A protein has these predicted regions:
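Glycan-processing catalytic domains of CAZymes
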Residues: 1-214
Length: 214
């Protein structure tokens, strides 16, 4: 059983101040939520564990223990690349991967390569979703860099999730992924390069998944 992880419940990534200026990430949206007045609305609510920093390894140890106790054995981390560098990696790198019990839980990446708009910003999300703050489209050269980094930093972890000896890698926005290469044929070549690099790193292959979210 796998659970998606939206790694924004931290203030450790400075660039999140664009959306949550108070400095503790998505918790700012949670705390600002009010009762909408319809039957069954249960807001405001306070998290059972409080407004914890999920980039803290001690917090992740607690969450791993809880997830495992309910049968969850894979975390799918939303992973981002904006403005020519990774974004929102703190919860994965500093939280999950430094948790002393992380070998109890497999993990994998879903490259959330959609455009970043004001959707995350409660102050503007109801009025402006057309402005692109960061594009999810990268160049083929950047994608090659992402592949190298992903293989070295994540695939080689003993608890990275695999199917039949192949690391599992997911892409969220298929349209943006194709735009990265320009054509579906070039996109295929990009995936073949990723698979080749993965095999050269000692794996049996690459298990590629795509999300049809539209």
């Amino acid at each position: 059983i796998a659970a998606f992880i939206w790694p924004s419940y931290t203030g450790d990534e400075p660039r999140t101040r664009i959306f949550w200026p108070e400095g503790y990430g998505e918790w700012q949206t949670v705390k600002a939520m009010t009762n909408r007045g319809y039957e069954g609305c249960r807001w405001p609510r306070i998290p059972t564990w409080g407004y914890v920093n999920e980039a803290d390894s001690r917090v992740m140890e607690m969450q791993i223990n809880c997830a495992v106790s309910y049968g969850v054995n894979v975390f799918i981390y939303d992973w981002y690349w904006y403005d020519n560098r990774p974004f929102l990696e703190n919860c994965l790198n500093d939280g999950f991967l430094k948790a002393r019990n992380n070998t109890q839980m497999k993990f994998m990446l879903m490259w959330a390569n959609h455009n970043a708009t004001h959707l995350w910003d409660k102050r503007n999300s109801d009025t402006d979703l057309s402005t692109v703050i960061w594009s999810g489209v990268v160049t083929p050269e950047i994608f090659s860099e992402i592949c190298d980094r992903t293989i070295e930093k994540y695939f080689k972890r003993e608890n990275y999730y695999m199917i039949d000896g192949c690391p599992v890698y997911m892409v969220f926005d298929v349209d943006n992924f194709i735009r990265t290469f320009g054509t579906t044929q070039e996109c295929k070549k990009g995936l073949e390069e990723f698979r080749r690099k993965t095999v050269e790193a000692g794996f049996k292959g690459l298990h590629f998944q795509a999300v049809n979210w539209k």
